[in-house]
Regions:
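Acidic, mature catalytic/reactive cores of soluble proteins
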Residues: 1-369
Length: 369
């Protein structure tokens, strides 16, 4: 697949921006899927908030969200030696961030998160994005520079909790089985969207685990005076091989994905980002490009009273729902100044569908109410 050219990098950062693990943990990113689901985290991968995760699925869109995949961790083997590109903080154990010394660049290519990892003479590029309109996150790994093939292990952590809660060991039970190119995790006692998650990589073999990883410390939650210890299950590890110049993708999804899907998700995000920047008349203007792309993250779909899909606006990530008051206040900035007048009209029509006696509800009813 030929990857579309990205717009100029946004928020292009190097190691000078993160002199230590604490500094790297203060730099956060966000990707969304247009349903209310999201992926968010820190530059280094260090979890700081209960909301940080690779796949936070909109299981009851747009406001009902479930943490399914808090993170995946990369381990790279070169010439028989393995390096962990990881960062964790444990209750009572401090910060363990061996990967930070290998992170040489972080930037946003449109709405795509891009990291460059250097391990000796090896340069590995990692791209992260969400599929539009469904609950799937994609990671595309490209071996940009190496004298020989390398092996990458993708260690997959799963959870099953409302995104504003935390888990304790044995809070949920799951069944782990093989799937094409990876693993299928079924969450016992749950049905519908989010009852299972597929962890798959191109050309990979999967090894199931099931071990509980306890005592993830979330420092921002602690600073705010909230519960701050989380626990997740290691579903297992996917192992793949990369040749110099080769790309292979990984997906975390609520459905089984076809081979090559991660690359298609990344490419679609790059194309969409370019179109959004062009529509806003912001090509070449980094500040306005960032505003146009950030504005897009707040726009979601909502089911209307007659069952049709309409438009709405999330009042803020990661914890707010969609509110009509905030939608009307933000409409000029989100949609008119960004060249998206037809979508502004759709938003107004969607809000009007909830009108009663000349009034609009600030909060929307749940399905069936």
């Amino acid at each position: 697949m030929t990857m579309p050219e990205a717009a100029d990098p946004i928020a292009d950062l190097g190691p000078g921006a993160w002199p230590d693990a604490r500094a790297a943990a203060r730099l956060e990113w966000l990707c969304t899927n247009g349903l209310g689901g999201y992926a968010c985290g820190t530059v280094s991968g260090l979890l700081q908030r209960r909301w940080h995760g690779l796949l936070v699925a909109a299981t009851d869109p747009p406001a009902g969200r479930t943490m399914l995949v808090p993170k995946v961790e990369l381990l790279v083997t070169v010439d028989g030696r393995t390096w962990a590109l990881t960062a964790n903080e444990w209750a009572g154990g401090g910060v363990d961030a061996p990967g930070l010394g290998h992170l040489v660049r972080f930037h946003m290519a449109g709405s795509v998160v891009v990291r460059h990892w250097r391990v000796g003479a090896v340069l590995l590029e990692e791209r992260v994005a969400m599929a539009r309109g469904r609950n799937a996150s994609a990671v595309l790994l490209t071996l940009r520079r190496s004298r020989s093939p390398v092996t990458v292990q993708v260690k997959c952590l799963v959870n099953r909790r409302p995104h504003d809660h935390l888990s304790r060991p044995d809070d949920f039970r799951c069944t782990i089985a093989g799937a094409r190119g990876g693993l299928r995790v079924g969450f016992d006692g749950h049905g519908g969207e989010g009852s299972e998650v597929f962890l798959q990589a191109d050309g990979a073999t999967g090894r199931a685990d099931g071990t509980w990883y306890r005592d993830y410390l979330l420092p921002v939650e602690r600073a705010l005076g909230y519960d701050c210890i989380d626990a997740s299950v290691c579903a297992g590890t996917l192992e793949l091989s990369l040749k110099p110049g080769e790309s292979r993708g990984f997906t975390a999804s609520t459905r089984s994905e076809a081979p090559g899907e991660a690359g298609r998700v990344i490419a679609a995000n790059l194309r969409r980002s370019r179109k959004l920047v062009e529509a806003a008349g912001a090509t070449g203007d980094h500040f306005r490009s960032r505003l146009a792309l950030s504005a897009d993250q707040f726009l979601v779909q909502r089911t209307l009273p007659d069952g049709r899909r309409g438009a709405s606006v999330i009042a803020g990530y990661p914890w707010f729902a969609d509110w009509s008051r905030d939608a009307l206040i933000s409409l000029p900035g989100l949609l008119l100044s960004t060249g998206r007048a037809p979508e502004a009209a759709e938003l107004l029509r969607s809000l009007a569908a909830f009108e009663k006696d000349g009034l609009l509800p600030n909060r929307f009813p749940a399905p069936g109410e």
